[in-house]
Amino acid sequence: MHILIVNNTSIPVQKYGGTERVIWWLGKQLVKMGHQVSYLVAPGSYCDFAGVHVLDHNIPFNQQIPAGVDVVHLNCKVNETPKIPYIITLHGNTNDQAPLDINTVFVSKNHASRYGSASFVHNGIDPADYGDPGLNQSRNYFHFLGDAAWRVKNLRGAIKIAQKAKISLRVIGGKRFNLNQGIRLTFDPRIRFDGMKGGAEKNALLKGSKGLIFPVLWNEPFGLSIVESIYFGC
């Protein structure tokens, strides 16, 4: 089967990007199962196991579907409904009051139930991207993992928890200076900002962590950072 995976960002992900990681791993496993995979994604994308096409929102979507595609897997909004079989994965929460497409699938049971659905598929991770979890390694801090500029991830709350518990916190995914939120005046030496990290750098930080501090302010659809942290035993 020829499967077209569609998203409006580029692949492969370099640092932060849960959806990008999920569709990359999904495509890789589908190829291993014997399927043909193509991506329709943002400019600058490349892939060594599947074809890559550039998504252009100014062109009718159906004109961008490569010849021979059997099913379309949408991970973002497009400008028209596919004329061939398709499925939509909703990765986040939406405030749009319009009814969701009947082909929408969610990423957890709770996520689906909040939209009146029972259709969900959990995200997975590829252990090959993470390596040895270092379960016997010494650990001396906790971590926050996520886009700190996104208020619902509640970095402020994570810092307060760490300070009240008098523990060290590594902030993976945020900087001390943020033009959108102003200067974070966090002078506590136990709070360290590591910025956006990916690959080996992020893995090394997770290996040294005792646990994830994750006081989100919304209904988390899935939480890839939770699964990544569990993989490393923290």
Regions from the language model: what does each represent?
Residues 14, 20, 149-153, 217-224:
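Nucleotide-sugar-dependent
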